[in-house]
Design a protein with these regions (language model features):
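Short intrinsically disordered terminal tails
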Residues: 1, 145-146
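N-terminal leader/targeting peptides and immediately adjacent processing regions
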Residues: 1-30
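Long, low-complexity or tandemly repetitive, helically biased scaffold regions used
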Residues: 19-144
Length: 146
């Protein structure tokens, strides 16, 4: 896709590309330039598809983190940083001007709450490490976003 989305059908294509993870920066740029008439029916379908894409990316990011082979400190840090980058990207996705302030705030809060939940879960699971090293790494390389 090489032009900014203007109608719902264009946005559906954009959301599919977003889900695939292909060329994130280019698709984000198109999303920022895109527009849509915010009216009943279209708005609900638009938000539904956007939330599906965002949830898909959130789930994929956490799955990739869990599947990564973290055998040493550097790999753990790299995995945490990759997870944070993905969360930051998803936050940029919902921060586009096409989305009204109320809906944008709700979406942003959903993603921020998810990042907080992931961080809490990581810290809780690190408590079983008797050396405290894993806990220190997780606390010093937080995945939480603002």
């Amino acid at each position: 896709m090489n032009k900014a989305p203007k109608i719902y059908a264009d946005w559906v294509k954009v959301f599919d590309i977003l889900k695939s993870g292909e060329d994130d920066e280019a698709i984000l740029s198109l999303m920022k330039e895109g527009t849509i008439v915010w009216q009943s029916g279209v708005a609900e379908r638009f938000l539904k598809r956007l939330v599906e894409a965002v949830n898909f990316r959130l789930n994929k990011a956490t799955d990739n983190f869990q599947k990564s082979r973290q055998t040493d400190e550097n790999e753990i840090i790299q995995s945490l940083m990759q997870l944070r980058r993905e969360l930051q990207f998803i936050l940029k996705v919902v921060d586009i001007n096409t989305i009204p302030v109320k809906e944008k705030t709700e979406l942003r809060n959903m993603i921020i709450n998810q990042s907080n939940s992931i961080q809490e879960s990581l810290e809780k699971s690190a408590e079983s490490d008797r050396t405290g090293k894993l806990s220190s790494i997780i606390k010093n390389n937080k995945v939480t976003i603002q």
